[in-house]
A protein has these predicted regions:
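Structural signature of tandem-repeat unit edges
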Residues: 1-4, 12-26, 36-55, 63, ...
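Consensus positions within tandem repeat domains that build extended binding/scaffold surfaces
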Residues: 6-9, 29-31, 67, 86-89, ...
Length: 660
């Protein structure tokens, strides 16, 4: 029974009408995102939540207009009962003229976005217009504000064709990007009542005027500030360089965004700058000279995104936060130093992602977290020293960089090594001082690195799937005495073509037998080193299960013997890609064989003894487990098309070999 129509549910659907059944109690106005064919909406009269009048959807008492169909009409008079126009109510519609009702109080976010409104008079009754309400109305050339509003929200008139804006006395604040990307806007008149302007609220090169008693100031560089020049709001004229006065403590969001001619920012001596907000210098592609003041505590999201000419950044003692994508794409950035950082500091996701020239990274002892993708794709970064204060390294944090050595300082507070944190670091060979505090090594953590050996930290309890996948140089894997390791994921040694030995001298959870790693009572074989020289392997009757991917890629194995009354379950891909494997027997005790167990075992041509004659069991071996049809036939029945005839290896031979 349909009860809810969620956002984007009918995205780009070319429908002209829609009917809402009685039980629908939730309707997202943007469910038709990208569709401009809808002409009318109808509704079951017994629906307790919604009502329809003239093809337009309202709440039951018609106080909220929920959805105006995109292709309904070019002119519309909103009923007198309506007090609220809902989120995305008219979005992307053909409406050109609208008459507001006398009781209207609120217009929600994006209500008229991407419509064809030409001019707009906001009634005095309206007190609240939410973000983006008239964004991208590219036919809108004039707006008159009512007396009920006190603020203009973020993005409210962004990307319109307004030519002049006169802000009335009742408005005290204008949000971020409220009139940004308005290419025809040449003049803005502000009242004396304005106390707050958001970053990039107007386009550059606009003529802004305000009375002498306004709480704003404009310097000869055409930089707009608050009255005391504590907050730098925006720059109104493009130039190659600017001097920031010592009074400034905050640079507002998008203040210098996309100033592609800007090459230099100079901060006056003694400046107490604390915050550089989001997108402040976004896309300043020629900015090469900037010395961050020691007083800065935080950098906003993308504040220096794609500043491709910045070469070095030295952070000061007050730093506490570098936000998401802050320096992402700064492809000339060579040196990043946190050595003066005296306060606990976090580095958010993607902060230095794609800084392909970064060679020198110095992290201070006060860095507490490095989030996901933070230093990913830093193609010149060769060495990293992890400070003892660092508690968290996010997924992909250093992935796909050229790091050759990672050194952990002690005593470390590190608990987890996250998924993919050092994956694809194809030059990483040395991990120095791996902390004993680490409890979890997550999936793909060291995938495709060049580490030659690995000692599991004593406090580690779990290692995730594919943790060492593709570590082609690893020869030895050690679980030290008293190590707390209990859980080992699947495929952790996939592609470890040199791993010939697993060591586990004294563990409460594991034991080594015949080169393989078992659980403590030897009832479950967990994994076998892919590069082991052992060619024949015989299970003992004590073994009851083989874990998934246990023998994955063991290319030296020729024969495997499973005794009667032993193994009952073989996990998925357990013997996959054992390319030399020519013989294995499957006794009646084996009840469950998972998928892809024999995938890639191209030498299992014939002579495989399968005692279970059940058609369904054998069918599953072929269709799910990857065993070929001919493998269960006598080798004498196979035609000469097979170059190598296969002869089953006798049980007695296998037992003698293992004993030797």
């Amino acid at each position: 029974m349909l009860r809810s129509i969620e956002q984007y549910a009918m995205q780009s659907c070319k429908v002209e009408t829609i009917f809402l059944p009685k039980n629908v109690n939730s309707f997202a106005a943007n469910c038709f995102e990208g569709s401009r064919t809808l002409k009318t909406i109808s509704c079951n009269p017994s629906n307790p939540t919604f009502s329809v009048m003239d093809g337009v959807l309202y709440n039951k008492d018609k106080t909220t207009l929920i959805k105006f169909p995109a292709n309904h009409s070019t002119s519309f008079e909103i009923p007198e009962t309506v007090t609220t126009i809902g989120f995305c109510a008219f979005i992307s519609s053909v409406i050109e003229n609208v008459k507001f009702p006398p009781k209207l109080k609120r217009i929600d976010g994006y209500a008229f976005a991407v419509t064809k409104l030409k001019n707009l008079t906001i009634p005095d009754t309206i007190t609240d217009i939410s973000g983006g309400a008239f964004a991208s109305c590219q036919h809108l050339t004039e707006v008159k504000f009512g007396t009920g509003m006190t603020y203009i929200s973020n993005d409210c008139f962004m990307d319109t064709r307004l030519t002049k804006v006169v802000i009335p006395e009742n408005i005290t604040s204008i949000g971020e990007s409220a009139f940004s990307y308005c290419p025809n806007l040449k003049e803005v008149v502000l009242p004396s009542t304005i106390t707050s302007l958001g970053g990039s609220c107007f386009p550059t090169n606009v003529n802004i005027s305000f009375p002498s008693n306004a709480k704003l100031s404009l310097d000869d560089q055409q930089i707009l500030y608050d009255l005391d020049k504590i907050v730098l709001i925006m720059c109104l004229k493009k130039s190659t360089s600017y001097i920031i006065p010592e009074t400034v403590s905050t640079i507002r969001s998008s203040a210098f965004k996309d100033m592609t001619d800007l090459t230099k920012i100079e901060f006056r001596s003694g400046i107490t700058l604390k915050m550089i907000e989001s997108n402040a210098f976004y896309g300043c592609s020629k900015l090469s000279s900037i010395e961050i003041p020691n007083s800065v505590t935080s950098f906003g999201v993308r504040s220096f995104y794609n500043c491709a000419q910045i070469k070095s950044v030295f952070f000061g003692s007050k730093l506490t936060k570098i936000s998401t994508r802050c320096f992402e794409g700064c492809t000339s950035l060579d040196t990043v130093s946190f050595t003066q950082c005296d306060s606990p500091c976090t580095i958010d996701s993607y902060a230095f992602n794609g800084c392909t020239s970064l060679r020198t990274l110095t992290l201070s002892e006060n860095i507490s977290s490095i989030d996901m993708y933070c230093f990913s794709n830093c193609k010149s970064l060769e060495r990293v020293n992890i400070p003892s204060t660092l508690k968290y390294i996010g997924i992909y944090a250093f992935s796909n960089s050229l790091i050759s050595q990672v050194t952990f300082s002690s005593p470390s507070q590190m608990v987890n090594l996250s998924k993919y944190s050092f994956s694809q670091c194809i030059h990483l060979r040395d991990i120095v001082g791996t902390p004993d505090t680490i409890k979890n090594i997550e999936s793909n953590c060291f995938e495709s690195t060049l580490i030659t050996s690995f000692d599991v930290p004593i406090s580690t309890t779990s290692i995730g799937n594919y943790a060492f996948r593709g570590c082609s140089e690893m020869t030895v894997f050690r679980i030290p005495s008293r190590c707390l390791l209990q859980t080992i994921g699947n495929y952790i040694f996939d592609g470890c073509v040199s791993l010939s030995k697993i060591e586990c001298p004294d563990s409460d959870f594991f034991v080594i037998d015949n080169g393989a790693l078992f659980n403590k009572d030897r009832s479950n074989l967990i994994c076998f080193p892919p590069a082991s020289s052992i060619t024949f392997f015989c299970f003992s009757q004590n073994v009851k299960s083989v874990s998934s991917s246990a023998f994955y890629g063991c290319k030296s194995l020729v024969g495997i013997m499973i005794p009667d009354n032993s193994i009952t379950t073989i996990g998925h891909s357990a013997f996959a890609y054992c390319t030399s494997l020519k013989y294995i027997n499957i006794p009646l005790c084996v009840k469950n064989i998972d998928q892809n167990v024999f995938t890639g075992c191209n030498n299992l041509h014939c002579g495989i003894v399968v005692q279970n004659t059940s058609i369904s069991f054998r069918y599953s071996l072929v269709t799910n487990s990857g065993l070929s049809l001919t493998s269960m036939k006598d080798c004498g029945l196979i035609t000469c098309k097979h170059v190598n005839y296969q002869t089953p290896v006798s049980t007695s031979y296998l037992y003698v070999f293992i004993l030797m």
